[in-house]
Design a protein with these regions (language model features):
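Short, charged interaction patches at domain edges and termini
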Residues: 1-19, 59-68, 104-140
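Short, conserved charged micro-motifs
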Residues: 83-88, 137
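Short, conserved turn/kink motifs that form compact alpha/beta structural patches or helix kinks used as
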Residues: 53-55, 59-84
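Small/polar-rich, solvent-exposed N-terminal microdomains that initiate assembly or binding
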Residues: 1-62
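A common structural junction motif
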Residues: 93-102
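"Short basic amphipathic alpha-helical interaction patches in structured regions
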Residues: 71, 88-92
Length: 140
């Protein structure tokens, strides 16, 4: 059996989402921080001034007998208001739904839902399953 190397799904998501949002005309798509962890809110790692943040988490997933795998991701979205958070989360889910690349072959996002927590910052959450394509690991 050939060893298969799969891409870093979080890095792929961050690159895709950040560039896709830059191309969008909606005001709530402007100045969105996209990363794989929540800021610590220290001087060196502040919450974004725009209050717009998208955080992705790779939740793993099974591989197949060929070069494919299923990557499950969780996506959290924050913005200044409940309405803006909802709009940004719906846009992010749509951008995931349309995402195709040499690595990502198919996506199935869920609909976002509100998950505002103790911080009182408006937040939403959705998940997606991605069919990703790996490549044969070169021999050493």
């Amino acid at each position: 059996m050939v060893a298969i190397l799969h891409a870093d799904v979080e890095a792929e998501f961050i690159g895709h989402m950040a560039s896709a949002l830059l191309a969008r005309p909606e005001a709530y798509a402007d100045s969105v921080m996209v990363r794989n962890r929540v800021p610590t809110e220290t001087t060196s790692d502040p919450w974004p001034a725009s209050k717009r943040l998208i955080v992705v988490r790779d939740d793993g997933g099974p591989t197949t007998q060929d070069v494919r795998a299923t990557a499950r991701i969780g996506v959290r979205v924050w913005a200044a208001t409940e309405a803006e958070t909802s709009d940004l989360a719906l846009l992010a889910a749509a951008l995931v739904r349309g995402w195709r690349s040499p690595v990502v072959r198919r996506t199935e996002p869920t609909r976002p839902y509100s998950v505002t927590e103790e911080s009182r910052r408006p937040a939403a959450y959705f998940t997606a399953e991605l069919t990703i394509r790996g490549r044969a690991l070169p021999t050493a």
